Amino acid sequence: PTWTYTHNGFYWAGAYVNSDFVLVTTDDGAEGYVTGRGSILSLNPKTGKLIDSLQATNVGDLRSSVCYDEETEAYYFTSKGGDLYQVKVNADGTFTKGSLRRLHLDNGADSASAPPMSTSTPVIANGRAYIGVSGTSQFTAYSGHNITVVDLSTFSIAYSVPTMGYPQTSGLLTTAYEDQDGYAYVYFFDNYTPGKLRVLRDKPGMT
């Protein structure tokens, strides 16, 4: 490899890359997901040198990839502690001071020991973020698993749709039909046997 960088572990975490910086999230370095805090790192894409880092403001490994939304000019990722994060980055790859925001997700139980964890990279379109969220028991049917829709203009949950299993991966979104009916369609799979393919039809303003 051209370079390597080690920090607490990178489990499932994919990177956002452009010519100026690489953004990647990390595990928290602690056992489980209710004690330590993961970080988001900004690295030089050519040398691997650390440009900047931010620690999450709540517990949990950070195991999603990082995505960028042009409309809000911000980057998004999720945590196993049950949060959606938003952060902004300067042109030099440093994080914009004071820009880190956190929205706690919901699985129907306000429990620190069974948080609404997410490893789902947010899929974003039209000011909406779509996220797969775990229930209180990862492999128990209908234990609070859901697809959560977040209104980014208010940085709040618009609504959620219950699922049989945990939608553990990212959704696949198409805007191909917006000119016809005004809706985006988002496809998610339950991580459950037998698996289910779910299609969510959504547009701004829906709750």
Language-model region placement:
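Extracytoplasmic/lumenal domain signature
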Residues: 1-207
